[in-house]
Amino acid sequence: MFKREEIIEMANKDFEKAWIETKDLIKAKKVNESYPRIKPVFGKTHPVNDTIENLRQAYLRMGFEEYINPVIVDERDIYKQFGPEAMAVLDRCFYLAGLPRPDVGLSDEKISQIEKLGIKVSEHKESLQKILHGYKKGTLDGDDLVLEISNALEISSEMGLKILEEVFPEFKDLTAVSSKLTLRSHMTSGWFLTVSDLMNKKPLPFKLFSIDRCFRREQKEDKSHLMTYHSASCAIAGESVDINDGKAIAEGLLSQFGFTNFKFIPDEKKSKYYTPETQTEVYAYHPKLKEWLEVATFGVYSPVALSKYGIDVPVMNLGLGVERLAMISGNFADVREMVYPQFYEHRLDDRDVASMVKLDKVPVMDEIYDLTKELIDLCVKNKDLKSPCELKLEKTFAFGKTKKNVKISIFEKEEGKNLLGPSILNEIYMYDGNVIGIPESFDGVKEEFKDFLEKGKTEGVSTGIRYIDALCFKITSKLEESFVSNTSEFKVKVPIVRSLSDINLKIDDIALKQIMSKNKVIDVRGPVFLNVEVKIE
């Protein structure tokens, strides 16, 4: 906490001095907790849900009302809508199936089996029979069966489950039996039901939309087909409705997503629930992608199908696949990877990787941590001293009940060299998926590498860590370890850097895995010629 009164008094006497000196009150974060190792974390929406919401708002702006159509559709409705074509259409539908409820009796043999488990049945026989009978009749849910058996016999639920497994094997041998109910394969099957019910409830014309999941039994899933997808569908009912409404709605809807210029091409499929010559494919031009794309289909429902539902006015239906539009908007190549990214490779950008490169060894004690900055400044200031040369830094630390006198010597004995090597000020950058050490100056850098390094410096993401920074933290961390182990001296020698570990850096395994899988590189090679000797008294 600041001593506010002292600061105000100091500022009243000499504002400039107070302004400069109080900067030390703002303590900098430790290096592994500083930017870019810390990064903002944002929630992330899913592109399909984003597209759904954008489509919802687009429909609402155009005056449509939102409805939820039935997901479960009786196969009889498919026959009513498709006529003779229904059999072929039903091949792509998923049928709902359920397990039958076996007629399980409580015979003498089963009573004997239960009693062999150490449970007396005689006084609970009637209660157990009622439970089994209730299950058969459907008055008892299957997920309550074990609990009710346990309660009836006054035993634990574990023992109740054992009885179900060992005494009533009929439950293990059940096979699902299909019903006549299907999961809707397209939104049309629901629109007939909805429009039919609204005919006597809403004045004509009316405009409806629904965005929801459909299910289609594809032979296989691939980059453009899934067995479950979202349909963004609308229906307009009114006496004067025709395919011109479909064209206008397609333009109004899709122009809100950046499409311009539209082509309406007769669809060769000719589904029987549409009036002949009305089923139309919509192609739209996307200026950013610079290509024509098929994005929607519309048509006017057949009077034959409408009449079976008591609908006596034309109904235009337009539908488009949400995933298709999301792929276009997000420039995705594979619908599976877009919808289920968790099952595919997670891509880290350079900013992500930069947050995953950290110092390996960092001192814990604040006094020793602060010593690191002094050591860094001393090395940087004198890096070009001509050898033979030596720098010394001395400090005294309180450690427990003792004092530690520390003498740090940085030296170069060989003549004709600098105190430190030319790569000592190299800085770690992320660029194009690579981790690279970039020099402060490009003087002396080979031309074949210069362009890459220059781009890395201007377009990449810096970690803010230089070789000398990381190495000095290695020295002070080793000093702290020596305090604990009561070591009196140690040396640090780093001639040539070949890997991150040579300069006291580590990278998260997730980032490392991506770098290796993408054939990217970690190239931090460079001469630093650091020689340090530390004595502790």
Swiss-Prot record:
PROSITE patterns: AA_TRNA_LIGASE_II (PS50862)
GO BP terms in the entry: translation; tRNA aminoacylation
Covalent S-S links between cysteines: none
Reaction equations catalysed: tRNA(Cys) + O-phospho-L-serine + ATP = O-phospho-L-seryl-tRNA(Cys) + AMP + diphosphate
Keywords: Aminoacyl-tRNA synthetase, ATP-binding, Ligase, Nucleotide-binding, Protein biosynthesis
Record flagged with keyword ATP-binding: yes
GO molecular function terms attached to this record: ATP binding; phosphoserine-tRNA(Cys) ligase activity; tRNA binding
Quaternary structure annotation from Swiss-Prot or TrEMBL: Homotetramer. Interacts with SepCysS.
Family, similarity comment: Belongs to the class-II aminoacyl-tRNA synthetase family. O-phosphoseryl-tRNA(Cys) synthetase subfamily.
Function: Catalyzes the attachment of O-phosphoserine (Sep) to tRNA(Cys).
Protein name: O-phosphoserine--tRNA(Cys) ligase
Gene: sepS
